[in-house]
């Protein structure tokens, strides 16, 4: 008997791609075939094949910040992308499609509807992106990570890597910690220059109280090392951290952006956080961060308000007991079965 097949529509950023990979891997273990639809010039083109998943491409890009010519051409570009996606869907014959966001899922979702293939949507953020808002009207089933994106969609959490849930619980991790507070600073793929420039000034005032790991992003190690100056021995600086689960588990508190995936990873491990949301016009990251700050598992500092002095005052007053309580609250907000639940819904609605 032929295996069932899922076509994944996701691309652009890790926040869309990594949760989709987690769902794909769950279904692969259940003898499903997976095919991916993306764009050639975004991260999925390099990343997805590393997981042994075949990928096909359509031509589409975002319109935000583009000139008038691009806007005038947009209807033709979208129509062309729908036709390209329709051809691929007719060739691949999937039993269901999973839309996880990114430009690619718009035209691909319309093509799936035209081909009569069930559409399962998953919204990773606390506020729905434009593509998912539109696709939500034609989708067979809509799922969401946070309870605020769609009024009646099932809340399943964000599918995150299994190794995050395998870390020891916060009370076990904290049981033998007596030395300096451990601070993990994650600039993320957007670099978060604001964190790279602020933290060296914080450490200059609190060097005797903090031990830092700082992920600075691509090409920033030398510049940030110079900013730390004489306090460099208190800090472990890296471009990227390969084992994020271990890094989160090492930390007493994480200072980072609040992309949807990051918020759910922090909940999965159970660690306190100071979120500095990226200043997006629809407040996406701020609303993601509220998922944990509303239960006192995290603090939000708006980028406009972030100063070294403010961070020094906040960190100075933190105790390990405070941070353990925050970590335990974060852990209660995690949803360890997200990938499994999305996979179940796909199986339920598939042709």
From Swiss-Prot:
It catalyses: di-trans,octa-cis-undecaprenyl diphospho-N-acetyl-alpha-D-muramoyl-L-alanyl-D-glutamyl-meso-2,6-diaminopimeloyl-D-alanyl-D-alanine + UDP-N-acetyl-alpha-D-glucosamine = di-trans,octa-cis-undecaprenyl diphospho-[N-acetyl-alpha-D-glucosaminyl-(1->4)]-N-acetyl-alpha-D-muramoyl-L-alanyl-D-glutamyl-meso-2,6-diaminopimeloyl-D-alanyl-D-alanine + UDP + H(+). Keywords: Cell cycle, Cell division, Cell inner membrane, Cell membrane, Cell shape, Cell wall biogenesis/degradation, Glycosyltransferase, Membrane, Peptidoglycan synthesis, Transferase. Gene3D superfamilies: Glycogen Phosphorylase B (3.40.50.2000). Pathway: Cell wall biogenesis; peptidoglycan biosynthesis. GO terms for biological process: carbohydrate metabolic process; cell division; cell wall organization; lipid glycosylation; peptidoglycan biosynthetic process; regulation of cell shape. It comes from the Bacteria. UDP-N-acetyl-alpha-D-glucosamine binds at residues 13-15, 125, 161, 189, 241, 260-265, 285. InterPro entries: GlcNAc_MurG, Glyco_trans_28_C, GlycoTrans_28_N. GO terms for molecular function: UDP-N-acetyl-D-glucosamine:N-acetylmuramoyl-L-alanyl-D-glutamyl-meso-2,6-diaminopimelyl-D-alanyl-D-alanine-diphosphoundecaprenol 4-beta-N-acetylglucosaminlytransferase activity; undecaprenyldiphospho-muramoylpentapeptide beta-N-acetylglucosaminyltransferase activity. The keyword Cell cycle applies. GO terms for cellular component: plasma membrane. Its EC number is 2.4.1.227. The keyword Chaperone does not apply. HAMAP family: MurG (MF_00033). Belongs to the glycosyltransferase 28 family. MurG subfamily. Cell wall formation. Catalyzes the transfer of a GlcNAc subunit on undecaprenyl-pyrophosphoryl-MurNAc-pentapeptide (lipid intermediate I) to form undecaprenyl-pyrophosphoryl-MurNAc-(pentapeptide)GlcNAc (lipid intermediate II). This is UDP-N-acetylglucosamine--N-acetylmuramyl-(pentapeptide) pyrophosphoryl-undecaprenol N-acetylglucosamine transferase. It comes from Haemophilus influenzae (strain 86-028NP).
């Amino acid at each position: 008997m032929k295996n069932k097949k899922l076509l994944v529509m996701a691309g652009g950023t890790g926040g869309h791609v990594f949760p989709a990979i987690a769902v794909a891997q769950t279904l692969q273990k259940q003898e499903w075939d997976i095919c991916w639809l993306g764009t050639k010039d975004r991260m999925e083109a390099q990343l997805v094949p590393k997981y042994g998943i075949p990928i096909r491409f359509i031509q589409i890009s975002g319109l935000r910040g583009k000139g008038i010519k691009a806007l005038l051409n947009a209807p033709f570009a979208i129509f062309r992308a729908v036709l390209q996606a329709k051809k691929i869907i007719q060739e691949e014959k999937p039993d269901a499609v999973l839309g996880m966001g990114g430009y690619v899922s718009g035209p691909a979702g319309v093509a799936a509807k035209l081909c009569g293939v069930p559409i399962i949507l998953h919204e990773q953020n606390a506020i729905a992106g434009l593509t998912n808002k539109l696709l939500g009207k034609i989708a067979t089933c809509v799922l969401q990570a946070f309870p605020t994106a769609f009024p009646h969609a099932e809340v399943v959490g964000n599918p995150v890597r299994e190794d995050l849930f395998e870390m020891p619980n916060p009370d076990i991790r904290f049981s033998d910690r007596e030395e300096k507070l451990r601070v993990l600073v994650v600039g993320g793929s957007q670099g978060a220059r604001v964190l790279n420039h602020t933290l060296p000034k914080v450490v200059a005032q609190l060097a005797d109280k903090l031990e830092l790991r700082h992920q600075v992003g691509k090409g920033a190690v030398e510049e940030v090392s110079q900013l730390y100056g004489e306090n460099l021995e208190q800090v472990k600086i890296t471009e990227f951290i390969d084992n994020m689960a271990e890094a989160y588990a090492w930390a007493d508190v994480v200072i980072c952006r609040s992309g949807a995936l990051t918020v759910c990873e922090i909940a999965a491990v159970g660690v306190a956080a100071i979120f500095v949301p990226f200043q997006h016009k629809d407040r996406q990251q701020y609303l993601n961060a509220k998922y944990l700050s509303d239960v006192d598992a995290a603090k939000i500092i708006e980028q406009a308000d972030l100063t070294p002095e403010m961070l020094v005052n906040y960190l100075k007053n933190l105790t390990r007991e405070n941070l353990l309580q925050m970590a335990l609250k974060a852990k209660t907000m995690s949803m360890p079965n997200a990938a499994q639940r999305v996979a179940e819904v796909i199986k339920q609605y598939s042709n």
